Amino acid sequence: MSTIIMDLCSYTRLGLSGYLVSRGVKKREINDIETVDELAIACGAHQPSVVFINEDCFIHTPSDSQQIKQIINQHPDTLFIVFMAIANVHFDEYLLVRKNLLISSKSIKPDSLDTLLGDILKKESGISGTINLPTLSLSRTESSMLRMWMEGQGTIQISDRMNIKAKTVSSHKGNIKRKIKTHNKQVIYHVVRLTDNVTNGIFANMR
């Protein structure tokens, strides 16, 4: 099973390589790369099953973010796991934001990786039908409200602008926190910004 690791932290590279080898992946099938251009070439050459990327490798350059977005779209059978570069926050969850794109904390546990990658590791094949997770999506109201929330508007302001009760705003905020698996506003904002960077944003149901 071909895999690619794009992370400038040698500790993370070592940890991921060790995990993959312990699960039966051969060392020669693990490719370390450093730049987005190298990633594009490696994905074309190896058709990897899984790619691990630290967002720090692309998030600071809009053209790199755009290229990552294109690479993810061009390789629908590859699972891309993007690690959030967020410090001093306890968050060890992961979210499927597209069929082939997971956003994850770097604190993800080996047994969580086993759950995600088990079938891929066994079958040595693409991801079709193997990730048994719901894709993150918000209702249209939740999506609009989240944007206002991120602009710094409070519950009362959102309530006035959307012409709904403050209690309803609080209820929607609770739903958003549940779906993104955290009560931490910093993590929620980070997930939204990262998703915006490498996709067209979190799915919003049009009803």
Swiss-Prot record:
Swiss-Prot/TrEMBL GO biological process terms: regulation of DNA-templated transcription
Transmembrane segments: none
Sample GO molecular function, one term: DNA binding
Record-annotated DNA-binding residue ranges: 155-174
Residue ranges annotated for the HTH luxR-type domain, each copy included: 131-196
Xref: SUPFAM superfamilies: C-terminal effector domain of the bipartite response regulators
Role noted for this protein: Component of the Rcs signaling system, which controls transcription of numerous genes. Binds, with RcsB, to the RcsAB box to regulate expression of genes.
Complex formation: Interacts with RcsB.
Family under the similarity heading: Belongs to the RcsA family.
Official protein name in the record: Transcriptional regulatory protein RcsA
Organism of this sequence: Salmonella typhi
Gene: rcsA
